[in-house]
Amino acid sequence: MEEIDAVITWVDGSDPAYQSRYKDQLGKRRDFKKQFMQEDEIVLCVSSIIKFAPFIRKVFIVTDGQSPNLNEIRRFVATDKISIIDHKEIFEGFESFLPTFNIRSIDALLYKIKGLSEKFIYFNDDMFLIKESSASDWFENNKGVLTGNWAKTYNTQPLKKIANTVKNILKIRPSYNAGQSMAANIAGFDKEYFKSYHCGRPQVKSVIKGFYKHNPGLLRKQLSYKFRNVNQYVPYSLCWHLLIKDANYNAAPKDKHIEIEKIRNYSPVKLKNTLINLDKNEDLKFLNIQDLNYTSKETIEIFKNWFYRKLTN
């Protein structure tokens, strides 16, 4: 079987040194402390990949001079597959753009991880596997399996373009979907873009590397922003649209993921019932929970205890 790796981008936002560097670049920011609170999602993310995706050869965690708590991960799985990758490694040749606090800049250089397999799956640390997964969930017949749906590109919707620009002016985080739409435009899709769901994203290293070889100026522009900017595309989405353009993909035959987008609105009882239904549904293998740190401690404890049981059974 062809080798497949996992890549996760992560930062310990509670680290005072990191916060100091961040503040030096940005200055005052609303809700700063809340933004950087975390609930050790990286432990659950990494552990779930190693447990439920045994075909994964290596798990690369890309971070800024930090390391997650490997002892916590060892409570659930062996850590011999894990490699910690510093930003300095992937920014070799682009050191002038460091430090960066911009996930869209970091993501653009993931293909430069030394020893990375040709095919890899890109995860955020709030994405989890909750049931056994096989390589064919991600790559089938040598093609990436893409999970999402088609939507109209932003260049065909003037009001959305304006709203995205206003967000940038007000320093509100630029639209995630607009960044995917821009990626589609770059790849030659003017009317529709393939909108990704929040689960792992299959990537092909040679496709990304080959594109930047012929478009070095585009890469340097992408790296030039310290923080997310309306003028940036979403890198993994660019890879997806290049795969689609070359008919080198498969659309996921059915949705195997669930998103809990606003967990702050979930009462403990509601979350319990949701997790019970997740266990019953054999088709659902992937879970995304956004902003776990914004909900109640009781709700967080319910989620973690449920996940701990899955990892230890």
What are these regions (language model features)?
Residues 48-56:
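Short, acidic, metal-binding catalytic loop of nucleotide-sugar glycosyltransferases
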Residues 3, 230, 234-313:
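Long, low-complexity C-terminal extensions of enzymes
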Residues 57-66:
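Short beta-strand/loop segment that forms part of the nucleotide-sugar
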Residues 145-226, 230:
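Long, charge-rich alpha-helical interaction segments
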Residues 13-37:
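A solvent-exposed, charged loop/short amphipathic helix patch at secondary-structure junctions
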Residues 37, 69-116:
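Active-site-proximal specificity loops/subdomain of glycosyltransferases
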Residues 14-18, 67-72, 92-93, 128-132, ...:
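Short catalytic/ligand-binding loop motif for oxyanion handling, primarily in non-cytosolic enzymes
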Residues 67, 109-150:
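GT-A fold catalytic core of metal-dependent nucleotide-sugar glycosyltransferases
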